[in-house]
């Protein structure tokens, strides 16, 4: 969550672990399940996963992620839920890393925050920058979008006969 002069703003991210790309996000004035559902819907729209594609959604035990509505939506999309252990940040290490980067690179650096709209717009800008320009060492010091493009281009290359 982010403190503003008008109250708190809650932010949720959905991350494609293979690509290390943020594929869904949402900011909200409340911490209700609907805002994390919106982030999930954005990710589903962006990725259009195949039903039965062995997709796993890992989250912490936040009330939004273990809610009936959220669990039902995962089941409808054919996604297997996986919930981490209580108090174990290593269970959700990538999400914890993304949240830490977001807070360091946006929230602490550019605050204090006036209102919801300021946080939402800054988050939009940061997600675009993160996906398309931020260099990530684990994927070869390239942005997530470029790493993903290279991977799919490699799959499309005809294999060389021996």
Q: In which residue ranges do the predicted regions lie?
A:
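Charged DNA-binding/catalytic regions of mobile-element recombinases
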Residues: 1-162
């Amino acid at each position: 969550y982010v403190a503003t002069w008008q109250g708190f703003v809650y932010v949720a991210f959905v991350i494609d672990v293979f690509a290390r790309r943020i594929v869904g996000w949402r900011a909200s004035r409340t911490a209700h399940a609907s805002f994390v559902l919106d982030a999930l819907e954005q990710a589903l729209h962006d990725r259009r996963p195949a039903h039965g594609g062995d997709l796993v959604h890992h989250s912490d035990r936040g009330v939004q992620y273990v809610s009936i509505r959220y669990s039902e939506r995962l089941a409808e999309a054919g996604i297997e839920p996986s919930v981490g252990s209580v108090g174990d940040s290593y269970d959700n290490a990538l999400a914890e890393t993304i949240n830490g980067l977001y807070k360091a690179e946006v929230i602490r650096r550019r605050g204090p925050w006036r209102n919801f709209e300021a946080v939402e717009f800054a988050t939009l800008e940061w997600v675009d920058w993160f996906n398309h320009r931020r260099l990530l060492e684990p994927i070869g010091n390239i942005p997530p979008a470029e790493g993903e493009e290279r991977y799919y281009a490699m799959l499309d290359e005809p294999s060389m006969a021996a």
